């Protein structure tokens, strides 16, 4: 097994436990907490929070509660994007990871609100854990109109635009914005948080 596999096996349960406990304890309304947790705890790979923590580990930074909170904040934001991507107005998916999507399980309005709640809560966790405006800046840029949301717009626009069908450059840009930006941000945030040098940051991202 690779070093990352060992790291993943050690830290995935920690991430899962933190997400489950804090979604239950920090969301006052039990129903919206349940709807949020349905998607967050649906068995994702936790790639983004693991990359954040693994980068910290590689840079010699000790992983404690604040670092786990930041990592889990990234996962909340990722889950928000999945809930909204699955909506009828977007990709219109009925299943994700072998389970009904949020809007199929709870209703479209409820799914929208769950996503709407996860996004700011994720940013809140990152801000609270890091005490860093720079990390908040990095995550909001990664998920905004020049990042993840921009990629989803290109995806939607491409369905009505025959001129980009099969265009490798367009597809690569769309996939980078939809997926790559948040993955890169997870590593970059860890590098900034750990105080990596400019040269180290360039090598990492």
Predicted regions and their residues:
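N-terminal amphipathic/basic leader segments beginning at the initiator methionine
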Residues: 1-23
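Mg2+-dependent prenyl diphosphate-binding active-site environment of isoprenoid biosynthetic enzymes
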Residues: 11, 23-205
């Amino acid at each position: 097994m690779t070093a990352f596999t060992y790291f993943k096996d050690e830290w995935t349960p920690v991430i899962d436990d933190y997400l489950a406990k804090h979604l239950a304890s920090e969301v006052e309304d039990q129903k919206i907490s349940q709807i949020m947790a349905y998607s967050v705890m649906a068995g994702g790979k936790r790639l983004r929070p693991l990359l954040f923590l693994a980068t910290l580990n590689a840079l010699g930074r000790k992983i404690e509660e604040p670092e786990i909170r930041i990592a889990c904040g990234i996962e909340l934001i990722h889950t928000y994007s999945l809930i909204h991507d699955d909506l009828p107005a977007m990709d219109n998916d009925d299943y994700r990871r072998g389970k009904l999507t949020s809007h199929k399980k709870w209703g479209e309005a409820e799914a929208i609100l769950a996503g709407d709640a996860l996004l700011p809560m994720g940013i809140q966790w990152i801000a609270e854990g890091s005490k860093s405006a720079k990390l908040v800046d990095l995550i909001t840029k990664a998920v905004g109109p020049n990042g993840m949301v921009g990629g989803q717009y290109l995806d939607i626009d491409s369905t009505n635009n025959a001129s980009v069908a099969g265009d490798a450059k367009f597809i690569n840009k769309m996939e980078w914005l939809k997926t790559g930006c948040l993955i890169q941000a997870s590593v970059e945030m860890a590098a900034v948080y750990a105080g990596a040098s400019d040269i180290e940051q360039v090598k990492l991202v």
